Amino acid sequence: MLNAAPSKIASDWLAGFCRALGENPRAAVDGFFLEDSYWRDLLAFTWNITTMEGRVAIADMLEATLESASPSDWRIRGEPTADGDVVEAWFSFETAVARCEGILRLRNGRCWTMFTAIKELKAYPEKKGVTRPLGVRHKADPNRETWSEKKRRQQAEFGISRQPECLIIGGGQGGIALGARLKQLDVPTLIVEQNERAGDSWRRRYRSLVLHDPVWYDHLPYIPFPEHWPVFTPKDKMGDWLEMYVKVM
């Protein structure tokens, strides 16, 4: 098996693990995971951000969540790669309520690390692509609202006829990104921030600050940075980007 192509190694492992998982979760972990293995879950199984270390913890998690999660339709996505004795592959699967994705790393034919995450809730798909808003009403209507009029009306109604269901404390990049996600799911959300303008949490820091992570790790949902964006973003440039993002999203 170890001399096979990475795609075959990953596909065979995933198919075998899925079969074994349906029969006996603990035996599946013992047979398909290294003793020194890790599984990090972002909501898909545990509805939490949780890291399981070692076979016992992984098996305990699966035994506790497998019935409610009901995972199915596991598939390798893209082309797996190999680096020495490690094979890396992206995969997708579904649970009872969500479409999910993950990445696994196999070492000597067994799982060394696995990451799983919810990508989309089945009952609450985001309004994008073919389901995006039309943005216009093609008929004569003297009471038609423009985009700006509708926005002002919704802002005036917020907190009166429509109450927030989620409160986000802090309007930095994390709070802003979460707010954008919740808006796409039509969840009324209030973000409270001590600074006057979006992005001020970056602008008000020391003069020479740039983001320590390169641009590829810093994208916000829906609007990635343009290709000419600097590798390390200056703080004031990041502040202006966040302010633009809030206005657009």
List PLM regions with ranges.
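N-terminal Rossmann-like FAD-binding beta1-loop-alpha1 element of flavoenzymes
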Residues: A156-I191
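A solvent-exposed, acidic/Ser-Thr-rich amphipathic alpha-helical stretch
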Residues: L2, R19, E23-D83
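Short beta-strand edge/turn micro-motifs at domain boundaries
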Residues: S92, R99-Q154
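Glycine-rich active-site loop/strand segments that organize a redox cofactor
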Residues: R203-D240
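Flavin (primarily FAD) cofactor-binding/catalytic cores of flavoenzymes
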Residues: A117, P164, V187-Q194, D236-M249
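Short, low-complexity N-terminal intrinsically disordered segments enriched in polar/charged residues
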Residues: M1-E35, R152-P164
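N-terminal FAD cofactor-binding segment of flavoenzymes
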Residues: R181-P188, Q194-W216
